[in-house]
């Protein structure tokens, strides 16, 4: 009997808080489970430099290459810590899948930029490395995002009912998993991104831990209505978005300057929840169960807002109820995509991205 294979996935999302690495076990293209996790936070200087690259400026090409190398060294460190925690050697790993750090996402121009020096990462880890997952989907006419619905379908689909899977990172995205049709999904809009940016600007904290500051505020109905009127939310799917559309300077155009900072933060929580609810109600009206993953699940104010918006129509759960830690899901998805690459299995959720066909995503690098 052929032995099972181990893969590592590394993910750093639009929240730009650090890198997650997850170890998974596969039997060819069959998922067997996730076995370990490591996390390395971004140093403050690195995070600031990455955020600076979101805006056009001088010497972007040089800065992007230097940051790609720094990120890849940090990714390699995270992978090494994961291997050490599991008493494994690089030779035990079939492949490593690395998403990289998104700094520009422009599907309307046919590109999405994730920083990672993949040959350097392969050299540092001494593991065959797969990356640049979004480019193949974009080349086939897709949005290049979200890429996780195919993974969600492989793990979480139920043949009796429609399920929704919600990932709340910097951007929130949903996967809709019908029992008898292909999975699809899209970005619903901001997840934690605006809340984090507001918290950083007004309290000099990386994020609102446990929603403690939002809990002290009140929802501003007029502000909420103005935010919800953004045309993105009326666009049909497939669609994807990012900081290019929903940055702090966008929010500030709706403020008169006299708002209480706690009230604005509280309103942003409801804004995320309402856009998710509207998206699910429109695209998956028959879904009665929604499984949540990503950093947003740790914010009790946001979770309460989601529960209030959905009411009794949809039951909310953690992906832990389906045997995958909500903090591990995205990194595990890129380990799974690396396994798809190795086994020549199309991993693209083309019904979610709008690509013309299923594609084998990524490019491989030997060490």
Swiss-Prot record:
It comes from the Bacteria. Pfam families: AnmK. InterPro entries: Anhydro_N_Ac-Mur_kinase, ATPase_NBD. It is an enzyme of class 2 (transferase). ATP binds at residues 13-20. GO terms for molecular function: ATP binding; kinase activity; phosphotransferase activity, alcohol group as acceptor. It catalyses: 1,6-anhydro-N-acetyl-beta-muramate + ATP + H2O = N-acetyl-D-muramate 6-phosphate + ADP + H(+). Pathway: Amino-sugar metabolism; 1,6-anhydro-N-acetylmuramate degradation; Cell wall biogenesis; peptidoglycan recycling. The keyword Amino-acid biosynthesis does not apply. One of its GO terms (biological process) is amino sugar metabolic process. Its EC number is 2.7.1.170. Keywords: ATP-binding, Carbohydrate metabolism, Kinase, Nucleotide-binding, Transferase. HAMAP family: AnhMurNAc_kinase. Catalyzes the specific phosphorylation of 1,6-anhydro-N-acetylmuramic acid (anhMurNAc) with the simultaneous cleavage of the 1,6-anhydro ring, generating MurNAc-6-P. Is required for the utilization of anhMurNAc either imported from the medium or derived from its own cell wall murein, and thus plays a role in cell wall recycling. Belongs to the anhydro-N-acetylmuramic acid kinase family. This is Anhydro-N-acetylmuramic acid kinase. It comes from Neisseria meningitidis serogroup B (strain ATCC BAA-335 / MC58).
